[in-house]
UniProtKB/Swiss-Prot annotation:
Annotated metabolic or biological route of this protein: Isoprenoid biosynthesis; dimethylallyl diphosphate biosynthesis; dimethylallyl diphosphate from (2E)-4-hydroxy-3-methylbutenyl diphosphate: step 1/1; Isoprenoid biosynthesis; isopentenyl diphosphate biosynthesis via DXP pathway; isopentenyl diphosphate from 1-deoxy-D-xylulose 5-phosphate: step 6/6
CDD domains tied to this protein: lytB_ispH
GO molecular function: 4 iron, 4 sulfur cluster binding; 4-hydroxy-3-methylbut-2-enyl diphosphate reductase activity; metal ion binding
Protein name: 4-hydroxy-3-methylbut-2-enyl diphosphate reductase
Residues where dimethylallyl diphosphate binds: 48, 84, 134, 233-235, 278
Gene coding for it: ispH
Entry note: cofactor: Binds 1 [4Fe-4S] cluster per subunit.
PANTHER family according to UniProt: 4-HYDROXY-3-METHYLBUT-2-ENYL DIPHOSPHATE REDUCTASE (PTHR30426:SF0)
Function: Catalyzes the conversion of 1-hydroxy-2-methyl-2-(E)-butenyl 4-diphosphate (HMBPP) into a mixture of isopentenyl diphosphate (IPP) and dimethylallyl diphosphate (DMAPP). Acts in the terminal step of the DOXP/MEP pathway for isoprenoid precursor biosynthesis.
Residue sites binding [4Fe-4S] cluster per the record: 19, 106, 205
CC cofactor: [4Fe-4S] cluster
Top-level taxon of the source organism: Bacteria
NCBIfam families, A to Z: ispH_lytB, PRK01045.1-4
The EC number(s) this enzyme carries: 1.17.7.4
């Protein structure tokens, strides 16, 4: 006699997973491999997700941390800069080495770079709200001369920082931060420095905000909230924090279904599920299947908005057709519409 499986409601958040910037970055590597052949070099992880990196490695991408790691014999092969952005010194170094590069920096990160440079042009010292050591922060700070940017990570930092000219300050933020935590830091800075100039547009990206809003709406009443993402993914870790603050009894970050500690979970009847902006939909499917093997699952879509954004790839590779099959290693059978939209605006 087959044992009856306990009932389980999965609140599947929407939006979740890949944002337009991550989609674009992965597509740039895939299209470069199709056009130029392997190897294609990628400086730093193209996005912070092990599954994506390994999938691209299997297709011929080689990941390096510095351009000096590219062998002289392969200097005619393209190198792709990651979605997080790079300091100005990196493309300058590539040009000095006569390397052909494709910049996969997310357009919204590039917007933050421009905001920081605008502050400086107007004579302001730049305050960057972000996490020390994150590639995006390194890239943003590297747009300006040494000493032109001060990094603020916490409300305490905002409370204790000092500047020579407190009347000429401007701030920008890392795109993947918690909206709530950032608001507290900005409030403290504005209280101390009334003339603090804000960026012309919001720095935190739409996808970060949308994913946090969806998790915040779904979390109340959840016994467990799972976020699919990598330990070094800033936006994924923020989603775990949002779920806890919004009322989930327990929340955790997992990279694959095999990471779920079933014994630790205990008795559950409602599970929230979302994915960071660099986590592929195929892993979400994998986790749902793992629950279906143990529970009688009912899926409820917890959708707060629908995203329609798409970013064009670099002009040099727009002549290459991108197919559903090309992206199946991360998308499975999902999100095929974005591929047809990608080639618009050649």
């Amino acid at each position: 006699m087959t044992q009856q499986r306990p009932p389980l409601e999965i609140r599947l958040c929407g939006p979740r997973g890949f944002c337009a910037g991550v989609d674009r970055a992965i597509q740039i590597v895939v299209l470069a491999l199709k056009k130029y052949g392997a190897p294609v070099y990628v400086r730093h992880e193209i996005v912070h997700n092990r599954y994506v990196v390994e999938g691209l490695q299997a297709r011929g991408a080689i990941f390096v941390e510095e351009l000096d790691e590219i062998p002289a014999a392969h200097r005619n092969q393209p190198v792709v800069f990651s979605a997080h952005g790079v300091p100005k010194s990196v493309p300058a170094d590539a040009e000095a080495k006569n390397l052909f590069y494709l910049d996969a920096t997310c357009p919204l990160v590039s917007k933050v770079h421009k905001q920081a440079m605008r502050h400086q042009r107007l004579g302001r010292h730049v305050i960057l709200i972000g996490h020390s050591g994150h590639p995006e922060v390194i890239g943003t700070m590297g747009q300006l001369p040494d000493g032109a940017v001060t990094l603020i990570e916490t409300v305490e930092d905002a409370h204790t920082c000092h500047f020579d000219d407190e009347d000429n300050l401007g701030f920008v933020t890392q795109t993947t931060l918690s909206v709530d935590d950032t608001a507290g830091i900005i409030k403290e800075l504005q209280a101390r420095f009334p003339n603090l100039a804000a960026p012309a547009a919001e720095s935190i990206c739409y996808a970060t905000t949308n994913r946090q809003d969806a998790v915040r709406a779904a979390a109340p009443g959840c016994d467990l909230f799972l976020i699919v993402g990598a330990p070094n993914s800033s936006n994924s870790k923020r989603l775990v924090e949002v779920a806890e603050k919004a009322g989930a009894r327990m929340s955790m970050l997992v990279q694959r279904a095999e990471d779920i500690e079933w014994e630790q979970i205990g008795d559950i009847s409602v599970v929230g599920l979302s994915a960071g902006a660099s986590a592929p939909e195929i892993i979400v499917d994998e986790i749902i299947d793992a629950f279906k093997a143990r529970f009688d699952v009912k899926i409820e879509l917890a959708e707060t908005t629908v995203e329609t954004e798409n970013f064009l790839v670099n002009r040099e590779i727009r002549d290459v057709e991108l197919t559903v099959k090309d992206m199946a290693f991360v998308n499975g059978e999902h999100r095929v519409v974005g591929i047809s939209k990608l080639m618009q605006g050649k």
